[in-house]
């Protein structure tokens, strides 16, 4: 019973804040923190609040761009960090440093960098700043996956006459796709909820949702904020489950399919 009690406490500690947010999104009270009865009016108010919807749209656009950019940079960086030379190991250490650096330090550096270079576009600043963390995270995930690949696969591809770019395209990338999807999804999620970096690099014309919520705390915090939070929570959860379903299994089939493609390519070239 001790283990059951401890498990219950841990579950409540982790999920009770989410339950409170969902419950208070149906609050009919004027204040978000005082229960006034059950109502779905907050969802209608959130949908018609143009400022709130604009902030959500900016966050989603930046998060999507961050996820895609992090997947590309993370793939290249992750493969480069799998080598045994000192430069490859240095790249791996740099990725670790990026993740270990306090966010406020990195955000300050990003702001100084953008001001020095004269980058004033808020979208560009947000995407680049968020992608620095996302790319490092994706690169480490890709590296871990790449180190677990069987060398015999690439030896077989080499016996079929495949060149390195062909092996990367037909073997490595399909096998690394689960890691890429995971890295892109995590980068999307971290970008969507990032506050510290967004406060430093965003502009008045490109205010993402976390910055908007922070500003609302200093004025009037209404229940429509909770409604948007529930929407984001459900959306990201469904997206995460879909990614898990896409990543589940299929590694061996992707491997066999890649080798068949290489075999067909080699036969065609030989003919």
What are these regions (language model features)?
Residues 15-29, 107-118, 185-190, 243-244:
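A structural signal for multi-pass alpha-helical bundles of membrane permease subunits
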Residues 30, 42-51, 191-249, 271:
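Interhelical loop and adjacent transmembrane-helix boundary motif
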